[in-house]
């Protein structure tokens, strides 16, 4: 399933240091509202969601930005060396560099919603809306660690990581990732922005329960809220 050539040209790399470069796609406008898509755990920017959003942004003459965190897709780095703090900081740096002072709507998919919630403390005045798709903030504790059998937990602690099988997927889960997740609590805060917040969640989602999206909505006190199932 080869991507359309025009889209391939939209992928660029931003160099952060000698050893770190992140791949991103964007639709540039100097002074326009942007859509910022933050992908999920082990996802890249060649999936259907970022592609559809890029197409939509072009059609509506909106700015667009999506990135691959380190250890994801074609970005540099090792997945097992990354964590929520690192990936959140990469998203922050990319937004500052590409979007600058423009306003934007955050769109987070799965783990991307966790990364998105971490952006509110930096871009409160620029964020004009938030859309979550199958949102999974704090999933490392709630959906992984708390449910792992003792044997897996022991392996992660003693060896530093373990490969977790989930259906046809395999995830290398490191102990530093789990520990860092505990430092990135976002569901113990309240968000005071008067913006539109929409959570989209599949009723048949077997990985992330709908309760996660409801919980995210409950944290926005002054927002105009909507849950789409």
Describe the function of each predicted region.
Residues 108-116:
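Gly/Ala-rich beta-loop-alpha elbow adjacent to hydrolase catalytic centers
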Residues 50, 195, 209-218:
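Short alpha-helix in the alpha/beta-hydrolase fold that links the catalytic acid
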Residues 73-98:
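Catalytic nucleophile-loop/oxyanion-hole region of alpha/beta-hydrolase
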Residues 125-173:
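Hydrolase active-site cap/lid region
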């Amino acid at each position: 399933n080869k991507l359309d050539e025009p889209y391939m040209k939209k992928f660029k790399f931003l160099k952060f240091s000698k050893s770190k470069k992140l791949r991103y796609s964007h639709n540039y406008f100097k002074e326009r509202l942007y859509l910022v898509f933050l992908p999920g755990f082990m996802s890249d920017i060649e999936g259907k969601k970022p592609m559809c959003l890029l197409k939509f942004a072009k059609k509506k003459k909106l700015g667009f930005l999506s990135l691959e965190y380190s250890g994801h897709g074609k970005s540099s780095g090792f997945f097992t060396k990354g964590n929520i703090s690192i990936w959140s900081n990469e998203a922050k740096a990319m937004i500052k560099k590409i979007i600058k002072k423009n306003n934007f709507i955050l769109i987070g998919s799965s783990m991307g919603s966790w990364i998105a919630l971490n952006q509110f403390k930096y871009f409160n005045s620029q964020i004009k809306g938030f859309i979550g798709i199958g949102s999974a903030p704090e999933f490392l504790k709630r959906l992984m660690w708390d449910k792992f059998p003792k044997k897996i937990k022991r392996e992660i602690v003693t060896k530093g990581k373990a490969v977790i099988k989930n259906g046809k997927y395999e995830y290398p889960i490191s102990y530093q990732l789990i520990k860092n997740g505990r430092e990135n609590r976002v569901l113990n805060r309240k968000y005071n922005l008067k913006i539109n917040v929409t959570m989209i969640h599949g009723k048949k989602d077997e990985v992330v329960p709908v309760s996660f999206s409801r919980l995210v909505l409950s944290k926005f006190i002054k927002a105009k809220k909507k849950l789409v199932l």
